[in-house]
């Protein structure tokens, strides 16, 4: 199961694995999973997320970002997710910066 732990204003849902002993991800060092979430006019993301959430909690369960907080739902086979691997946090003169890498990976359920 994935648990929604945060929804950012930029439209990313931060997910954490809660119970997924059979979840196999290619990189074992992954710390956080990110799904690309729609801006409300990006229908492909809206439809994908609505379908995913409705499969867990029934029709019409998506009504806004606030209802995604602490939601959990199963991971589907072959769903593409963003894997954000933040390796180093470095402070630079005049401000802070995060050195990390976000990339598309494919996640498989056994």
Swiss-Prot record:
Query: Is Chloroplast given among the entry's keywords?
Result: no
Keyword annotations for this protein, in alphabetical order, are: Membrane, Sarcoplasmic reticulum, Transmembrane, Transmembrane helix
In which compartments does the protein localize? Answer: Sarcoplasmic reticulum; Sarcoplasmic reticulum membrane
Q: Which residues cross the membrane?
A: 33-53
- Looking at the record's lineage, which domain of life comes first? Eukaryota
Recorded GO CC terms: sarcoplasmic reticulum membrane
Q: In what way does this protein cross or attach to the membrane? A: Single-pass membrane protein
Q: What does this protein do?
A: Putative sphingolipid-gated calcium channel.
Describe the protein's quaternary organization and the partners it interacts with. Homodimer.
Indicate what this protein is called per its UniProt record: Putative protein SCAMPER
Q: What is the originating organism of this protein?
A: Canis lupus familiaris
């Amino acid at each position: 199961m994935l648990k929604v732990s945060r929804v950012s204003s930029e439209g990313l849902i931060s997910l954490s694995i809660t119970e997924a002993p059979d979840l196999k991800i290619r990189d074992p060092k992954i710390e956080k999973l990110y799904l690309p979430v729609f801006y409300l006019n990006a229908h492909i993301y809206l439809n994908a997320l609505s379908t995913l959430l409705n499969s867990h909690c029934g029709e019409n369960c998506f009504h806004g970002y606030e209802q995604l907080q602490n939601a959990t739902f199963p991971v589907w086979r072959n769903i593409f997710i963003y894997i954000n691997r933040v390796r180093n946090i470095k402070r630079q003169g005049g401000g802070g910066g995060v050195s990390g890498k976000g990339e598309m990976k494919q996640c498989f359920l056994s």
